[in-house]
């Protein structure tokens, strides 16, 4: 709530959840007249227009890791200036195929390091994710990288099969990219 309170926000989207912090956020937004949408099965695949040239679609997917199966999870598809971008967050790539975006020409797909690894192994990811750029995010900072994700991503960049991909690893604080 500190971030929302200190920056101008025109609207917020977040998964519907009965957890107290989520309810407190909704209360906070109502008091400040900031529009918000709690995403649920009833909003799945709805497309929102956010200005003249921006569209947002959120669709539910399974969260990665059996211990998180009850955690509400969504992917975000954002369209702007004729480009399509997908944020997969912690989608369960072992069971999801992302058929929702099949046939979509993605400018960029944002995947976490584990999903990035799975893109190279059809035994792990059974779908197709075709994008001009694969942006690897959720890479831990050096001091937090107990599972050596940074090194794993770095090695995969030069492994067989990666030569045809345009990969943008996002691993540094405040790092910016241009698509």
Spans of model-derived segments:
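Core dinuclear metal-dependent hydrolase active-site scaffold
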Residues: 38-104, 170-179
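Active-site metal-binding motif and surrounding structural segment of the metallo-beta-lactamase
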Residues: 1-17, 103-110
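Active-site environment of divalent metal-dependent phosphoester hydrolases
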Residues: 1, 18-22, 46-47, 92-96, ...
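Short internal beta-strands
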Residues: 8-21, 133-140
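Binuclear metal-ion centers of metallo-dependent hydrolases, dominated by the metallo-beta-lactamase
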Residues: 33-51, 98-103, 122-179
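Metal-dependent catalytic neighborhoods of phosphoester/phosphodiester hydrolases
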Residues: 1-8, 23-27, 145-153
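Metallo-beta-lactamase
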Residues: 77-128, 137, 141
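Hydrophobic/aromatic beta-strand patches that form the interior of the parallel beta-sheet core
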Residues: 13, 37, 57, 86, ...
């Amino acid at each position: 709530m500190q971030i929302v309170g200190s920056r101008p926000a025109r609207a917020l989207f977040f998964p519907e959840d009965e957890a107290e912090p989520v309810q407190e956020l909704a209360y906070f937004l109502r008091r400040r007249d900031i529009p918000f949408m709690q995403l649920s099965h009833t909003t799945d695949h709805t497309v929102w227009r956010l200005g003249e040239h921006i569209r947002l679609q959120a669709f539910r997917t399974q969260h990665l890791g059996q211990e998180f199966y009850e955690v509400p999870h969504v992917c975000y598809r954002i369209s702007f200036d004729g480009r399509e971008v997908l944020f997969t967050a912690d989608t369960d790539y072992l069971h999801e195929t992302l058929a929702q975006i099949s046939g979509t020409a993605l400018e960029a797909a944002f995947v976490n390091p584990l999903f990035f690894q799975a893109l190279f192994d059809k035994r792990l990811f059974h779908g197709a994710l075709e994008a001009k750029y694969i942006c690897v995010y959720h890479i831990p900072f050096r001091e937090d990288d107990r599972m050596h994700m940074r090194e794993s991503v770095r090695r995969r960049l030069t492994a067989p099969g990666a030569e045809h991909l345009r990969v943008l690893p996002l691993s540094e604080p405040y790092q910016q990219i241009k698509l």
